């Protein structure tokens, strides 16, 4: 299964594909923070993957 919002990830494929955020469809991706914070999925999944 795919991972939810702010869950650690290694690649975009681990995060949900899309979500509706404030009425707009957003592509979800694995974002990496600076200073060794690690990578996490960009938006909350809800139940859709």
Curated annotation (Swiss-Prot):
Keywords from the UniProt entry: Disulfide bond, Knottin, Neurotoxin, Secreted, Toxin
This protein's record includes keyword Nucleotide-binding: no
Tissue: Expressed by the venom gland.
Keyword Metal-binding: no
Subcellular location: Secreted
Molecular function (Gene Ontology), one example: toxin activity
Cystines in this chain: 2-16, 9-30, 15-41, 32-39, 45-49
GO terms for cellular component: extracellular region
Domain of life: Eukaryota
Role noted for this protein: Potent toxin that may paralyze and/or kill insect pests such as H.virescens (lepidoptera), S.exigua (beet armyworm) and M.sexta (tobacco hornworm).
This protein's domain notes: The presence of a 'disulfide through disulfide knot' structurally defines this protein as a knottin.
Name of this protein: U3-plectoxin-Pt1a
Species whose genome carries this gene: Plectreurys tristis
């Amino acid at each position: 299964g795919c991972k939810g919002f702010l869950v650690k990830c290694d690649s975009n494929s681990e995060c949900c594909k899309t979500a509706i955020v404030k009425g707009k469809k957003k592509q979800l991706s694995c974002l990496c923070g600076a200073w060794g914070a690690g990578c996490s999925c960009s938006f909350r999944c809800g139940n859709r993957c």
